[in-house]
């Protein structure tokens, strides 16, 4: 798929949840087009609907939630045929999408890793399932992913367990697993929240590198506008289940239009690099 081609299109999407007899309208008529190769940041405070919105792309809504109207169309499939994600109901259909087409990195890497399996086995499982490699070929590919995400001594680390890794290293492993699935779209849900500032910057830089090397489209979910200044091509600002403003990073940072965007910007202190200022 060529850069800047439409890869995902959301039209008038509405999602509701039944909560003890009451209806919560979580997503309110969102329209959004996402293009191959871009990094789109979705920014908003906790409870604004960011995670609910993107989980709907993978059929991961809680049992009491559902898409009540609107469409989600995916255009990145190998056969070139669009897939209407909003119409998928069966788990077997979603299994064709999850991982291979759209993968997700969660906020806490420990919830994504099996504490009873070695790091190498967990990455290799994704390689075997989504790339069809076996044995020595799968192992060598796994070592390659460990190197790509910046983990030193991959042959040694291959045999170690999650508790033997720091938080930043675990997040690198989770990124390796996601990329090993060969996805077109990588959703990163608050991937740096649990990390200190220095490690945050390293993980964001790694995501930029993975985007280029593996030809990914990245959707970055965060409550902090400060972490997206030097990674996002576009920024969508969410408030109360709707996208209230969308634009390039420069437009959002230097010429915000919506009062909520102003409020988010006023809550952070940014040190702009010369590249960002240019």
Where are the model-predicted features located?
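Short, glycine/charged-rich "phosphate-handling" switch motifs in NTP-dependent
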Residues: 234, 246
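A short, proline-enriched helix->beta-strand linker immediately N-terminal to the Walker B motif
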Residues: 180-184
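A short, surface-exposed alpha-helical micro-motif characterized by mixed small hydrophobic
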Residues: 228-230
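The feature captures the beta-strand-to-loop junction immediately N-terminal to the Walker
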Residues: 43-44
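Short catalytic/signature loops enriched in Gly
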Residues: 4-6, 81-85, 152-156, 248-274
């Amino acid at each position: 798929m060529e850069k800047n081609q439409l890869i995902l299109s959301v039209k008038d999407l509405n999602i509701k949840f039944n909560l003890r007899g009451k209806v919560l309208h979580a997503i309110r008529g969102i329209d959004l087009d996402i293009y191959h190769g871009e990094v789109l940041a979705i920014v908003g405070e906790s409870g604004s609907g960011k995670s609910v919105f993107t989980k709907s792309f993978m059929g991961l809504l809680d049992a009491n939630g559902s898409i009540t109207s609107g469409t989600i169309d995916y255009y990145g499939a190998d056969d070139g045929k669009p897939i209407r994600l909003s119409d998928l109901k069966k788990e077997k259909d979603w299994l064709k999408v999850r991982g291979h087409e759209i993968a997700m990195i969660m906020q806490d890497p420990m919830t994504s890793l099996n504490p009873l399996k070695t790091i190498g086995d967990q990455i290799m499982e994704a390689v075997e399932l989504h790339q069809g490699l076996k044995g020595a070929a799968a192992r060598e590919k796994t070592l390659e992913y460990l190197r790509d995400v910046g983990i030193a001594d991959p042959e040694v680390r291959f045999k170690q367990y999650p508790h033997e890794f720091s938080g930043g290293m675990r997040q690198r492993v989770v990124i390796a697993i996601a990329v090993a699935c060969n996805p077109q779209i990588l959703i990163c849900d608050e991937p740096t929240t649990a990390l200190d500032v220095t490690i945050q910057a390293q993980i964001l830089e790694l995501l930029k590198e993975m985007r280029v090397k593996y030809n990914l489209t990245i959707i970055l979910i965060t409550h902090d506008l400060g972490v997206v200044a030097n990674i996002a091509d576009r920024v969508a600002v969410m408030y109360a289940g709707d996208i209230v403003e969308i634009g390039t990073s420069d437009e959002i940072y230097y010429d915000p239009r919506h009062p909520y965007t102003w409020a988010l910007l006023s809550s952070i202190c940014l040190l702009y690099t010369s590249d960002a200022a240019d």
